[in-house]
Amino acid sequence: MEAILSFAGIGINYKKLQSKLQHDFGRFLKALTITARALPGQPKHIAIRQETAFTLQGEYIYFPILLRKQFEMFNIVYTAHPVSLRTLPCVETEFPLFNYQQEMVDKIHKKLLPPYGRFYLHLNTGLGKTRIAISIIQKLLYPTLVIVPTKAIQIQWIDELTLLLPHLRVAAYNNAACKKKDITSKEYDVIVGIINTLRKKPEAFFEPFGLVVLDEAHELHSPENYKIFWKIQLSRILGLSATPLDRPDGMDKIIIHHLGQPQRTVSPTTTFSGYVREIEYQGHPDFVKPVCINEKVSAIATIDKLLQDPSRIQLVVNETKRLYSLHTAEPQKWGTNEPYGIIIFVEFRKLLEIFYQALSKEFKDVEIIVPEVALLCGGVSNTALSQAHSASIILLTYGYGRRGISFKHMTSIIMATPRRNNMEQILGRITRQGSDEKKVRIVVDIKDTLSPLSSQVYDRHRIYKKKGYPIFKCSASYQQPYSSNEVLIWDPYNESCLASTTTPPSPSK
C-alpha cells in the first residue's frame, strides 16, 4: 500500500485502507477517537465531545506523522510531498542562555533535524520557553511561523525576536496588518500570528514554512483551534507549554497525537523566596450564600455574588495600599527608583472595571494599568502593554494573566477572587527567570470562610507548599475589612508547626 507523506500528515487511500482492514476498519477508527471525560457540573455537549486523530480530504484519510509506526504492518511505501524551502540569512548573533536552556536547545535541535521532527517542550512559567524557541529558529534557518493565542503574547514575541535576531525580517500577522498588505513567508523570515486569524488561512499559506512554533500548545484542544493541526503538519513542529497535561477533561491526547509526549528540562537552580498572606474573610450573610443553576452550585455566579459585597472590595483596596506602602518604602530605603509591582487577579472582565474604579479613588497619583481592557476593547494595546512594563499596579483576569504575560518587575499577587486551577502559571507571573530573585515574593490569598468555594484554598496550599512559601493566616470581616492577627500556620522548615506569631519577612532580603 502506498501513502503520501505530506504537510497534511500521512495520507492513505480511504477505500484501500478500508478494504485492507475490512470488518476491523470501524474499530480501528474508534481507537483513534478521543472523548472528553464527563466532569461534575459540566454541560452535556462538552462531556460527550469527540475528536479524532485523522481527517478525510478527498479520497485520502490523513493521520498525524507521529502515528507512522502504527502503519508499518500495512507495508506502507511513503511518497514525500515535494516542498522547496528557502534558507534564512546566517548571521552570527549570540545571546545568553542559562545552562538548562542550552541543554534543551541542543536536544530540540537534534530532534528537529530533517527529514521531519516533533518536540513538545514542557517548561514551567517564567523559565524562558520563548528564548529557547528563538535559539532553535537561529539554528535551523528556515522560514518560521509562530502561532500564539493572544495579541499580548504576539507583541512579546515580536519584541524578543527583534531584540535577539535583529537581522531577520519579522512580521505580526493579524487582521489589521493583512488588510494593508499580504504577509507571507516570501517577504518575511518569521511571522508571528494569532491562531484565531491563522486558522482561517488555506493550507497553501502554511506549506512554505520549514518550522512551526506553537506557543501555549496545550490550548489547541478546542474544536476550532484543533483544526489548524491539519494545516501545519510540516516537517518540523515545536510545541511550548508550562502545563501540557493539565486538562481535567483528558483532551490533552489530541495535542500529543501531533506533537508527542511533552519533554521536560532540568529545573534551574534559581529560587525565589516568598510567603503567603492568607486572609480569612467573613462576608456579609447577604453575599456569601451559594448561587445554584439547575440545582448545582455555579462557581461563576457565586463569585459574582461575593464581589457585590462592598466591604470585600474595600479589603482588596486596603491590602493593595498595604503592599504599595511596602513597595515604595523599600526602594527609597535602598536608594533605587524601581518600585515593586503588584498584580491583582480577578475571575472575569466586568470585575476589572469595578476594582479599577475602587483603586483609582485611593491611588490618585498612581498609574493603574489594565492592558487587557485596552486589548479586548480595541484600544491602543501596544501602548497599554508598554506602560504595564513600568506600572506599579496591574489588573488582570486569571484567564488572561496565565498566558505567558511577562512583567519582570512584578513581585506581588493579590488574588481578589477565589481560584483553583492554573495556580502554577499564576504564581509564575512573579517568578520569571532573569528577574530580581533578591526581592521577596508576596501572595495575598483571600479565603471566603462562609462560602462553599472556601475549600479551594487547599488546592492552592498544595502549590504554595511546593514553592516552599510559608503561609501566614490573618482575619477580616465585612464589619472590619482590615486584616489582623497574623499567625504562621505552615513553615517549610518546620512542617509540624501549628501556629506562631512569627513576623513575615521584609520585601527585601
UniProtKB/Swiss-Prot annotation:
Query: What residues bind ATP, as annotated?
Result: L123, N124, T125, G126, L127, G128, K129, T130
Conditions for induction: Expressed in the late phase of the viral replicative cycle.
Signal peptide extent: none
Keyword line: ATP-binding, Helicase, Hydrolase, Late protein, Nucleotide-binding
The chain positions of domain Helicase ATP-binding read 110-262
> What GO terms are given for molecular function?
ATP binding; ATP hydrolysis activity; DNA binding; RNA helicase activity
* Name used for this protein in its record: Putative ATP-dependent RNA helicase QP509L
Chain span(s) of sequence motif DEAH box: 215-218
Q: What is its EC number?
A: 3.6.4.13
Q: Which residues cross the membrane?
A: none
**Key word Hydrolase present:** yes
What species is given as this protein's source? African swine fever virus (isolate Tick/Malawi/Lil 20-1/1983)
Per the record, the similarity remark reads: Belongs to the DEAD box helicase family. DEAH subfamily.
Catalysed reactions, as listed in the record: ATP + H2O = ADP + phosphate + H(+)
Superkingdom, according to UniProt? Viruses
